[in-house]
Amino acid sequence: MAEKNNETIIVNGFAFSDETEAQQAKKEQEGIAYISGKLDMNHPQMVLEIYNKMVEEALFETIIGEMYLKELRDYLVTIPYLNQEEILPVPVIHRQA
């Protein structure tokens, strides 16, 4: 969901001052909704594989995507039978101000 508020654009509760980044965040939010609809959280190994693939492919560029990856990672680290070393860290993209 995106809304314009003076000079900022709100996407999923985050205020973006850059319109290009806001549009990217909106695309990522739509992608997240699609992925979430397909992802079966009852199969952690599958979640891990998809999570790692998203990280390796640098699928997300905005805080919206980073937060989604963080949520998935937080879930994965709670699964005792997963090898914690296989769970990649969430990459943080440096943004130009």
Predicted feature locations:
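Intrinsically disordered, low-complexity linkers and terminal regions
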Residues: 1-97
